[in-house]
Amino acid sequence: MTEEVFPLEVNGARGEVALRIGKTPVVIAATMAGLAAVSTRLECKSLADLFVRLSGVEAAATMAAIELLTVRGDKAAAIAALKLKDFKACADAFALALSHHFDGEPKND
């Protein structure tokens, strides 16, 4: 069985991440504006709170992130197709997008 090619352009240098929800492909990016919008919608008190909510299996956080962090693809179709089985892939994609902000940063030892 061959793996299906992702049909949308993904700019990894910009921190974009491919995500397939059901059969709907979207590209997400953790832009500062998007993160601020998700944080505001979820009433997060800190970046740590936002990260925990996006990393977990929480319906409101997952739906908000799909809506507000999608930079390419049909976010409305992705939200409509969303099922519980998609939450792990979503959490993994959100974590990967967030990690872009920390890549190349010196470590605090």
Give the location of each predicted region:
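Short, surface-exposed, charged amphipathic helix/loop patches that serve as local interaction elements
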Residues: 2-14, 32-109
